[in-house]
């Protein structure tokens, strides 16, 4: 993936493989270095630093650390007040910081992961379904943070508001084919050209899987 223009910074990846969402998750795992591609290659720019929000964060919280201790390990600044400031942006207040990460709810774990992204200082953020388990207040806080983020965002989300207000480039995976368009989400959905491409890719795959009688 190569973003040529500095203005093309927020990309949303939309998966149309149906109930199998593995395709986009595999793409994120490849881009984050967690998985090697079967073929092809990609290269990050020399000045980029990346941070990844996985769809499954279970392994991240298999410890007895408190929230503050857990986040401090990812912070370039180890001052507790500094770390608590990032937690506060994701609606963790006061005594929340001494909770053990092992017992956090799904929504609290997501907010911890988002705090980790922010505190990392990375200029490329990759987020795979970041709104899962979040309530409306947390989704609004996330949306505001993504809008203000000055770097590159590559994300997937089912939340229409976040995609519409944040993304200026839509990449859609249709049965293994990639549609790539610099546009807002609503314009993408209303585009006859994009609808034709989705139809052509879907029909092509249907013919590919057609078995003739012998």
Regions found by a protein language model. Give the residues of each.
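Single conserved hydrophobic/aromatic residue that forms the stacking wall/gate
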Residues: 1-9, 13-15, 207-214
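Walker B catalytic motif
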Residues: 129-130, 135-137
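ABC-family P-loop ATPase nucleotide-binding domains
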Residues: 54-129
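ABC ATPase nucleotide-binding domain signature region
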Residues: 13, 19, 23-79, 109-112, 139, 167, ...
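Charged, heptad-repeat coiled-coil alpha-helices that serve as long linker/dimerization "arms"
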Residues: 190-210
């Amino acid at each position: 993936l190569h973003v040529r223009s500095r203005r093309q910074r927020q990309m949303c990846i939309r998966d149309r493989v149906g109930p199998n969402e593995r395709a986009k998750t595999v793409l994120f795992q490849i881009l984050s270095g967690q998985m090697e591609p079967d073929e092809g290659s990609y290269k990050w720019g020399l000045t980029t630093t990346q941070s990844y929000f996985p769809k499954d964060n279970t392994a991240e919280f298999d410890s007895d650390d408190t929230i503050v201790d857990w986040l401090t390990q990812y912070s370039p600044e180890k001052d507790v007040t500094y770390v608590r400031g990032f937690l506060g942006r994701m609606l963790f207040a006061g005594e929340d910081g001494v909770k053990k990460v092992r017992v956090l709810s799904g929504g609290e774990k997501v907010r911890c992961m988002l705090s980790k992204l922010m505190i990392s200082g990375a200029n490329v953020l990759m987020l795979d379904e970041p709104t899962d388990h979040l309530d409306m207040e947390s989704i609004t806080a996330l949306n505001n943070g993504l809008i203000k983020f000055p770097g590159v965002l590559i994300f997937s989300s089912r939340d229409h508001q976040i995609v519409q207000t944040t993304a200026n480039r839509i990449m859609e995976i249709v049965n293994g084919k990639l549609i790539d368009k610099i546009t807002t989400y609503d314009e993408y959905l209303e585009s006859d050209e994009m609808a034709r491409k989705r139809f052509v890719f879907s029909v092509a795959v249907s013919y590919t899987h057609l078995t003739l009688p012998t």
